[in-house]
Amino acid sequence: MSIVVENSTVLSALTEKFAEVFGDTKKVEYFFSPGRINLIGEHTDYNGGYVFPASITIGTTGLARLREDNKVKLYSENFPKLGVIEFDLDDVENKDGELWSNYVKGMIVMLKGAGYEIDKGFELLIKGEIPTASGLSSSASLELLVGVVLDDLFKLSVPRLELVQLGQKTENDYIGVNSGILDQFAIGFGEVKKAILLDCNTLKYEMVPVELRDYDIVIMNTNKPRALTESKYNERFAETREALKRMQTKLDIQSLGELSNEEFDANTDLIGDETLIKRARHAVYENNRTKIAQKAFVAGNLTKFGELLNASHASLKDDYEVTGLELDTLAETAQKQAGVLGARMTGAGFGGCAIALVAHDNVSAFEKAVGEVYEEVVGYPASFYVAQIGSGSTKLDVE
């Protein structure tokens, strides 16, 4: 899969940088991998539920070419002080501390483990536009970028679903974050102006046209420093697993996503612990909320959809406890503004971004009003971007 793009200022600058770092630009190929927003369905993916994400036009660009030896050479425009990171193909099992090169090593390990032959080194220059710790999936964007780079350079013909699953495996088994498949799936399967309703239990999915009429999706970035591995992500994963285990003593279920709200409420005594009940209630209620939200979205009932965004945020705040001052200030201030149908945090939480459904004509006033309140409460500014929904990870044919 590839898309034709014009040689933009960004690509020209990256081409020059590639020549500066690696000597010339012979046989260089171009690639792009998006970030993602999740419209609704948060922390449901690893609980066997539904998610409703879309890939966005902010992402990670890569320039790559094969080498004739065994060396892998990497350079990131985002971390120029690191210079060129170099390792041997025989050394991919050994992690590089906390460096971004681990995502490259992880994808090599997973592809080779799946039986694909990666028998030469390569050079890769990347530039990520996704703000670090924004909750817009910079890590999954990089994993899938590396996936499409290796797939193309080594002519592997990896089925897209397998590539997505290997991206998740890299995150889980190499990096050590117990994430579900939401991020990699959204980034691997994204299409222009379409969201994806994905059942994370079966991996059945439906592409849903994004028809917002006079509304925009505004991304609001807290700009709070955050590392996913330092957040309570793995803790929430463990808590919902424990709640499921306790419910399985009586109920024949494989995941919390199989339960209706009523079935869950009737069996909370099986869990016993109040904190675990809250965690599991979010997973169950959010999953059912997502199914209703998608139907409202398709029917063009954006008012109902917005109300469900608000309910999602409240559940993430009160039951799942993954929001915090910054995200609550953004989402709750946004919900009070003129022209706003709904707002909620998106991504893992603990920082990162929130989204709001805002009338197009109100966006400027909205950003000003929410920005002022946020800076007053938190002490530093938020950033705002209107989301454009674009294609998934792909090779670029540059004209």
From Swiss-Prot:
Signal peptide: none
Active site: D183 (proton acceptor)
Binding site for substrate: E42, H43, T44, D45, Y233
Residues flagged as site, Transition state stabilizer: R36
Keywords per UniProt: ATP-binding, Carbohydrate metabolism, Cytoplasm, Galactose metabolism, Kinase, Magnesium, Metal-binding, Nucleotide-binding, Transferase
Pathway in which this enzyme or protein is active: Carbohydrate metabolism; galactose metabolism
GO MF terms held by the record: ATP binding; galactokinase activity; magnesium ion binding
GO biological process entries: galactose metabolic process
Listed GO CC annotations: cytosol
Catalytic activity: alpha-D-galactose + ATP = alpha-D-galactose 1-phosphate + ADP + H(+)
Main enzyme class: transferase
Its EC number(s): 2.7.1.6
A Pfam match: GalKase_gal_bdg
Amino acids binding ATP: S76, A133, S134, G135, L136, S137, S138, S139
Residues that hold Mg(2+) according to the record: S139, E171
Subcellular location: Cytoplasm
Protein family: Belongs to the GHMP kinase family. GalK subfamily.
Task performed by this protein: Catalyzes the transfer of the gamma-phosphate of ATP to D-galactose to form alpha-D-galactose-1-phosphate (Gal-1-P).
PANTHER family listed in its UniProt record: GALACTOKINASE-RELATED, MEVALONATE KINASE/GALACTOKINASE
Record's protein name: Galactokinase
Organism from which the protein derives: Lactococcus lactis subsp. cremoris (strain MG1363)
The gene coding this protein: galK
